[in-house]
């Protein structure tokens, strides 16, 4: 039985070598997941999250030289930047997993459960947005659009 069995550890390399990589164990610690999801699917969420977060970052952060220059001008140290980057990627991957595992059924309870899980992915993506703002030196947007 796969429920409650531990997920195997797999390092998912970042396409940009100077940016931090994430391990599937990091996702297991962030979310309550077990072997029913599978290590390859978790790794796929992380790869997609890399693409999403890297797409939201300015192009100047993809060169090691310009990244170091950015860190010195924005008064953010490398460790803080790395933590914010990991937080952004992890929460985006968690939001992707939450979106894919929304439980809808034909009962009213299923619709309520689905709505709760959608707000969970919205909260996770707000953390992603705040982390990217912290990395780039932009102000955090705290306005909720209807």
Residue locations for each model-derived region?
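Short, glycine/alanine-rich amphipathic alpha-helical segment
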Residues: 71-84
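Alpha-helix boundary/capping detector
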Residues: 52-57, 72-75, 111-115, 119
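Conserved short "hinge" loops at termini or chain/domain junctions
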Residues: 1-72, 133-146
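Short loop/turn elements at secondary-structure junctions
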Residues: 81-146
């Amino acid at each position: 039985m796969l429920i409650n069995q531990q997920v195997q550890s797999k390092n998912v390399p970042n396409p940009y070598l100077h940016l931090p990589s994430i391990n599937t164990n990091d996702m297991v610690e962030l979310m309550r997941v077990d072997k029913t999801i599978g290590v390859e699917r978790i790794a796929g969420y992380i790869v997609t999250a890399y693409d999403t977060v890297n797409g939201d970052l300015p192009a100047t952060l993809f060169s090691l030289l310009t990244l170091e220059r950015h860190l010195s001008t924005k008064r953010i140290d490398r460790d803080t930047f790395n933590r914010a980057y990991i937080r952004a990627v992890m929460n985006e991957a968690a939001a992707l997993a939450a979106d894919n595992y929304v439980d809808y059924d034909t009962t009213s309870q299923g619709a309520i459960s689905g709505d709760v899980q959608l707000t969970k992915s919205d909260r996770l993506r707000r953390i992603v947005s705040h982390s990217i703002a912290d990395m780039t030196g932009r102000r955090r947007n705290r306005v909720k659009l209807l």
